[in-house]
Amino acid sequence: MARIAGINVPTQKHAVIALTSIYGIGTSRAKEICAKANVAPDKKIRDLSDSEVEALRQVVSEYQVEGDLRRQVSMDIKRLMDLGCFRGLRHRRSLPVRGQRTKTNARTRKGPRRPIKR
């Protein structure tokens, strides 16, 4: 197992697909990382040399991924809630933030239905 950004990247997958297992790296960013590191995107991780894996590590370290990114996102949400802006209030009340309807849908965000007690 190759270890990049503190994550065991799957060795049986192509470099582009394997990089997407790191939080904060999608397909387009994975292609960009492979291009910067001069690694063929269709080459499997187990077939990469140590220098190529090290080049991938070096390029990935330039981006904010995994724990740092999770911390940044949670701090951004906390900042919105502290400001008391509309988006922060929606986060605080566990409701959809981006204008979706809530009369009939939004069950994932609101949680299971609670019966009305009479």
From Swiss-Prot:
GO terms for molecular function: rRNA binding; structural constituent of ribosome; tRNA binding. SUPFAM superfamilies: S13-like H2TH domain (SSF46946). InterPro entries: Rbsml_uS13_C, Ribosomal_uS13, Ribosomal_uS13-like_H2TH, Ribosomal_uS13_bac-type, Ribosomal_uS13_CS. Residues 94-118 are annotated as: Disordered. One of its GO terms (biological process) is translation. GO terms for cellular component: cytosol; small ribosomal subunit. It comes from the Bacteria. It holds the Pfam family Ribosomal_S13. Keywords: Ribonucleoprotein, Ribosomal protein, RNA-binding, rRNA-binding, tRNA-binding. NCBIfam families: uS13_bact. Belongs to the universal ribosomal protein uS13 family. Part of the 30S ribosomal subunit. Forms a loose heterodimer with protein S19. Forms two bridges to the 50S subunit in the 70S ribosome. Located at the top of the head of the 30S subunit, it contacts several helices of the 16S rRNA. In the 70S ribosome it contacts the 23S rRNA (bridge B1a) and protein L5 of the 50S subunit (bridge B1b), connecting the 2 subunits; these bridges are implicated in subunit movement. Contacts the tRNAs in the A and P-sites. This is Small ribosomal subunit protein uS13.
